[in-house]
């Protein structure tokens, strides 16, 4: 508790000295997908829905004549005056530190069939209960015509299971993919970077810990907390890059519709559990290149992107790989969004080495709540026979998933979800496997 209080006061103090009136994430590239940006944007939309009169920038309550003025202003807002309100407290901190903050907490029970593995005699416990917490922060340190924009971005993923794990459910259902994005207990520092955007908004240099998962995808097939849930539809199913590793990248944005990146990372930190700079001295690096085009047309905005990467052989992942991912997402009018992905990887790092995705989504289809969302998609994945070595397996596995997110106010939503696996790869004795789930999401 003492540490938390110290951290909060330090952030308020530093923000009061360095901050200006704009956020750390550029607002002039809205269609280039980034998981952190989407989460913060979603939180900002919810705040404007709940408090329309507060959607414009807030004037400071008191001129900053003292280093503790930001702390005084937060307390003056009385965020807990009518009971504990985390969203109001975070909103007050955002105003005074010139930052964007979001915290998403998801509870996901899932039921599955078949209930037991092929050679098992006892049914697996149902449902699996997944608890997913993800805090995200973008903090702009400075913004000036001569120095440009400097910001710190942070994202963390914490996964816990109760009663049973998704890994056991995967084994029982006989699927080579997964019933969700994280099949077991996880602690991942997805992002902790400092970025410098030079005047003109054309060149950005970033250094720190980051993951390619943040840019590899489109609006609804890249985040289990807000879009599709199954492994093959919530991320790149053949990805062999790190969940988070230290490195650096350069971003070139000649026009708002074009985004080009190239970078490197330490090859040793595969799961991103720590921020380890020492590994950079071991001289093994992963490299990537990324291109995104976000055109604007009469039908609606879209994004078309290509990612290519290579990873080195290290003890934590003892195979060298080369991978690629082609993505598209296109708005067709105000309510319909279509998307697709083709991705693959060489080597023996993962069960699936090819995946093909096609789907559609409709946000707020009846103008009831900004969180309302309907989605349906299909993924066909090719099983990697060098990794899945059982005698009897299927070469391909198909999952069809549909869900409906129902918003309750600005911060709570429920999402019934259905996944049907046609010809599960590891259960040739079964024609299909089914997974039912209800995602409860609480955001602040």
UniProtKB/Swiss-Prot annotation:
Transmembrane stretches, start-end: none
Tell me the compartments it is located in.
Cell outer membrane
Q: How does it sit in the membrane?
A: Multi-pass membrane protein
Q: Where is the composition biased (Low complexity)?
A: 46-56
Pfam families annotated for this entry?
A: OprB
Could you read off the lineage of the organism from its UniProt record? Bacteria, Pseudomonadati, Chlamydiota, Chlamydiia, Chlamydiales
- Taxonomically, the superkingdom here is Bacteria
Family to which the UniProt record says this protein belongs: Belongs to the OprB family.
Q: Which GO terms describe its cellular component?
A: cell outer membrane; pore complex
**Its biological function?**
Facilitates L-arginine uptake, as part of the AaxABC system. The arginine uptake by the bacterium in the macrophage may be a virulence factor against the host innate immune response.
Instruction: Share an example GO biological-process annotation for this protein.
Output: amino acid transport
Q: Under which name does UniProt file this protein? A: Porin AaxA
Organism of derivation: Chlamydia felis (strain Fe/C-56) (Chlamydophila felis)
Q: Where is the signal peptide?
A: 1-19
Per UniProt, what is the name of the gene that codes for the protein in this document?
Answer: aaxA
Task: Outline the segment boundaries, as ranges, of region: Disordered.
Answer: 42-68
| GO MF term (any one) | porin activity
Key words, A-Z: Amino-acid transport, Cell outer membrane, Ion transport, Membrane, Porin, Signal, Transmembrane, Transmembrane beta strand, Transport, Virulence
């Amino acid at each position: 508790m003492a540490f938390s209080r110290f951290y909060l006061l330090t952030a308020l103090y530093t923000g009061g000295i360095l901050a200006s009136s704009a956020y750390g994430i550029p607002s002039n590239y809205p269609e280039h997908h980034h998981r952190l940006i989407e989460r913060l944007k979603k939180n900002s939309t919810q705040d404007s829905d709940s408090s329309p009169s507060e959607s414009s920038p807030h004037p400071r309550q008191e001129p900053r004549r003292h280093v503790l003025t930001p702390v005084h202003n937060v307390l003056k807002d009385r965020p807990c005056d009518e009971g504990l309100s985390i969203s109001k407290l975070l909103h007050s901190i955002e105003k005074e530190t010139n930052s964007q903050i979001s915290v998403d907490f998801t509870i996901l029970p899932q039921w599955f069939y078949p209930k037991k593995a092929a050679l098992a005699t006892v049914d697996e416990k149902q449902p699996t209960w997944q608890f997913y917490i993800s805090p995200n922060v973008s903090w702009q340190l400075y913004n000036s015509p001569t120095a440009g924009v400097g910001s710190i971005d942070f994202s963390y993923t914490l996964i816990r299971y109760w009663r049973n794990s998704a890994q056991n459910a995967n084994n029982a259902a006989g699927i080579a993919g997964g019933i969700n994005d994280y099949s077991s207990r996880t602690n991942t520092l997805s992002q902790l970077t400092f970025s410098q955007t030079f005047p003109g908004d054309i060149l950005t240099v970033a250094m720190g810990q980051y993951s390619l998962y943040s840019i590899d995808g489109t609006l609804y097939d890249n985040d289990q907390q807000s879009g599709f849930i199954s492994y093959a539809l919530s991320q790149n199913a053949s990805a062999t890059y790190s969940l988070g590793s230290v490195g650096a990248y350069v971003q070139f944005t000649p026009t708002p519709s074009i985004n080009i990146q190239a970078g490197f990372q330490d090859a040793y930190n595969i799961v991103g559990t720590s921020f380890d700079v020492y590994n950079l001295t071991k001289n093994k690096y992963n490299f990537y290149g990324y291109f995104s085009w976000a055109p604007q047309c009469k039908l609606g905005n879209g994004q078309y992107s290509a990612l290519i990467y290579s990873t080195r052989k290290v003890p934590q992942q003892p195979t060298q790989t080369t991978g690629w991912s082609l993505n598209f997402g296109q708005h067709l009018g105000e309510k319909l969004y279509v998307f697709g992905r083709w991705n693959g990887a060489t080597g023996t790092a993962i069960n699936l080495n090819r995946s093909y995705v096609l789907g559609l989504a409709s946000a707020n289809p009846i103008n009831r709540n900004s969180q309302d969302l309907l989605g349906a998609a299909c993924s066909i994945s090719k099983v990697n026979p060098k990794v899945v070595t059982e005698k009897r397996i299927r070469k391909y596995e198909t999952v069809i998933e549909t869900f409906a997110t129902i918003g309750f106010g600005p911060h709570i939503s429920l999402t019934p979800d259905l996944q049907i696996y046609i010809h599960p790869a590891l259960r040739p004795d079964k024609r299909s496997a089914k997974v039912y789930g209800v995602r409860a999401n609480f955001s602040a």
